[in-house]
Amino acid sequence: MNSERQGYELIDFGEGRKLERFGSITVDRPARGAWTPKAIPEAWESAELIYRGERMNASDGSWQVSSESGRNLDELMKGWECKTRGLNLQIIPQRTGQLGVFPEHWSLWDWYSRSIQEGITRGPVRVLHLFAYTGSSSLWMASHGAMVTHLDAMKHAVDWARVNAKLSGLEDKPIRWIVEDARRYAARELKRNSLYELVVLDPPSYGHGRNGEAWEIHRDLVSLMKDCWQLLSENAIGVVLTSHSLNISAKELRMELELATGKTNRIQTVVFPSFLEDCSGRRLECGEGIRFEPVGSMDH
């Protein structure tokens, strides 16, 4: 396989769908927010694996291969590898239309590596990564010197992340693999007086913890964010929150954190779009993120 055919590429998007290449396989699947016309209509003929459904998580959604591709659906459903920036990641089609990675998160990696390398000059950089899924960002941060606690409530996601670590030659990096509910674990870490320099979280709109605990972002995010902020050390880098469905503004969250700590004007927020750029230079919006950075030292 040629090296240029091993990575990720957003080829085109439009009419509610996106055309992507993961390694050697071209995939056509739904994309929320992709309602512009397609820029390269002829490119869609190259799709080999297609998710049939008007949206992700469709109850009637299913994967099919195009008749022209010559691909075998059963073989593709077993998975294949995609290389990106030194990492080898396992791609496995899910019944929800997901593939096990969120490429829009990779635009944060340069900021992670810079922040970690700057942080290491002051001491160890401990990262708590919540809702960490299959681990591409955990692996990126570990490969740049961080000690990472990778946590997800789904055992199969953590097992998948460990496979990605092995495929990437990073199984010996300082990564702790935890299957647990994010809120339960953060609260327990507070009781243990554990501290981290960086907390990263990508919560879903809805979900369930390891023991069936219900998660609803509009109900549970603020209390979790308060715990995350309290877990920061005196050498804190901050808290990074990404989501496809935030229902609260950066200003409101900052005010909640300041209220919880009893300190004002001590938190800086940076809002950034989460997006992918296609071959024509167009941006597909995929949500947004917020960085919460301490102003001055952290006092507990």
Regions found by a protein language model. Give the residues of each.
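Non-catalytic substrate-recognition/targeting regions of SAM-dependent transferases
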Residues: 6-20, 27-103, 110
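Conserved alpha-helix/loop element of class I SAM-dependent methyltransferases that forms part
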Residues: 103-122
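Conserved class I S-adenosyl-L-methionine
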Residues: 123-133
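Conserved SAM-binding loop of SAM-dependent methyltransferases across substrates and taxa
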Residues: 134-146
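Conserved SAM-binding motif I beta-strand of class I
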Residues: 147-152
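S-adenosyl-L-methionine
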Residues: 154-200
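S-adenosylmethionine
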Residues: 182-263
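C-terminal catalytic and target-recognition region of SAM-dependent MTase-like enzymes
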Residues: 236-300
